[in-house]
Amino acid sequence: MTKEKSTVPRLRFPGFTDAWKQRKLGEVADFSIKTNSLSRDKLSSYFYEVQNIHYGDILTKYDAILDVCNKELPSIIGSTISDFADALLSEGDIVFADAAEDSTVGKAIEVRNFKGKNVVSGLHTIVARPKVSYAPYYLGYLINSTAYHNQILPLMQGTKVSSISKANLKSTTVVFPTLPEQEVIGSFFSDLDQLITLHQRKLDDVKELKKALLQKMFPKGNGNDFPELRFPEFTDAWKQRKLGEFMKESKILGSKGDIARKLTVRLWGRGVVSKKEIYSGSSATQYYIRKSGQFIYGKLDFLNQAFGIIPPELDGYESTLDSPAFDLLKGINGQFLLEFVSRKEFYYYQGNIANGSRKAKRIHTE
């Protein structure tokens, strides 16, 4: 066993002063637990005796801690406990996804709260079972930290699909304080996750409410001048006009693509932002200056709700004519316009009557 090294984090809870220990993961965890290579078609949402952790779910569905009792896991079709007796997971096991199409390879979960359920680890996974006592949740959060994952990045292999080997995982370093400090850290991050889940549910509820109100607070057309639902102080009939009467396309000549400060319209109504590669591009591509308050959309992503109002901080940034921008004329409010065009019945109808295939429709300004 190698000599233990000590380290101290920059931020820690008050009352703890002891140095942290540093060890190779292969020294403190057993990697001999069996996994299976069952594909998705061998799994079912119906309950069988043995449930399975698939690497794809680790990468996309599960957080750092997998609460088995309160999470729906796929079952292995026709499985019995005797078939997998030597592969059953235990409380506190760490399960790594050893393959991915990007740098998420090595993402892991700490498995907790079995409550009698029988769970095994599946395709493209590696199980690390702690050989020493760790506080609940501590390892799960540690191994999903940026500091730990940065150790994995140079150890990845492959081009189109990246992978990490069991030997390389064993060579990575884990750090840990005393058990009482581990308990405080684990509980802290667990509480944060629960808070995030609570707010996510509230957010989902508000999104559903907004979706319903967008259907009811605009007239449905076909000669209907009144919305189904409106604020009580307003009783006048709504007017119906062509959108072009309220906006004028802006074509202020800007820079070429190699020097333009670029902006882009995010999908699904998530606003207008600067591009990460702000100054990269072709010197042959012409860009146009955009102004704060203009309405802008993506021609190729019209069906993906690529609409926005340019914010003040992006005043003077540029886009090509594939993301045209419009000055809004008197008589229309920019936020009202944005909500109006963000309704599914609007952008789906306009997109479906446009020319081009479903995957490559370019919605022109006229």
Which sequence ranges carry the predicted segments?
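Short amphipathic coiled-coil heptad-repeat segments
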Residues: 1-17, 201-236
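Non-catalytic DNA-recognition/assembly elements of restriction-modification systems
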Residues: 12-36, 171, 229-253
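Hydrophobic structural patches
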Residues: 13-14, 185-196, 231-232
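Amphipathic, low-proline, heptad-repeat alpha-helices and/or compositionally biased low-complexity charged/polar-rich
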Residues: 22-23, 198-200
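DNA target-recognition domains and sequence-specific DNA-contacting regions of bacterial/archaeal
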Residues: 29-176, 244-366
